[in-house]
Structure formats: C-alpha cells, structure tokens
Amino acid sequence: MSMEETAVLLSIHPEWCQKIFRGEKTMEIRKNFPKDFQGQPFKCFIYCTKGQNAGFRMEPDGSLLRLDGTVIGEFTRDRVYEIAPLNHAPDDLEAQACMDRDQIWKYTHGKGYAWHITELKTYETPLDLAAFHLRCENALRWCNNGGCAMHIERPANGNCCGN
C-alpha cells in the first residue's frame, strides 16, 4: 500500500494546530497509532476541532475565516516512538511536543506514542469533513447504500482512516 493510498484523519485542538503550523510542535502525542502502518510513513490530515481557542485567518477582503471545525492541512508521519510505558523517544521529546512530562503522562495514562511531523502543508482553503471518504470493508454494514465509501460527518475519537 503506497502512502497516497494510506491516510489518517487526526482531531487536534486549535491551540495545538497553531503550534504545529508555527513550527513549534514537531511531535504529536497520541494514545495509539494504526498498527497496519507500523514502519512505513503515512499522510495525516489535520482536523482542527471546534473550540474556544479557535484559529482565524484574515482573508484578502478583510473578512475573518474561522479555521476550527475544518481540515486545515496535512503532514507525513515518518517515525513513531513508544513513549510509555517504555520511553524510546528522543531526549528533547517534551520540547518537540510542547508539553511537559506531567502533561504527557496525564494525557496518555501510561501508554502512548510520539508521532514525528514532517512535510507539513497548510491548505490555502480549509476542507470540510464531507470532502473525505471512509473506505468500507463491508459497504452494507457501514454505509447501507451499496457503495464502497461513506462521507465523514464528524471526526472519530481516535484515528480515522480514509482518503
């Protein structure tokens, strides 16, 4: 399976999205990762969740474009490190993740991974979730429409594979 065929949609809070796009955050802390993709790079679409700390962008006409609740960009996850219960991550993990050790432990509850962010791209125009499709193993079970893809209407709690 090529990287073009393999992708994950990640829900990320607006404050973390801002740090990623400013280049401050180069490691994304997750509670899990898709085991099917272990050892191979894959694309990650960034869904900026809706929240109080929403990001905005000034448009050429002077209007503000709200970025939360949309897919605002993508990156390639080229490496993953197990960070708990064993720590196989770089020594500067906290700095790369923009989190201290206590925050990481509280979030992962003792089991987690650090995803290395590379090849970051910001979309000029954010995408709605409806632009993405989830490939179904059993269309009747998942879609009930006889097709082989369904629109994503909300991000999954964890990872959501699609393309």
Enumerate the predicted regions with their spans.
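Structured alpha/beta reader/binder surfaces that contact nucleic acids or chromatin modification marks
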Residues: 2-163
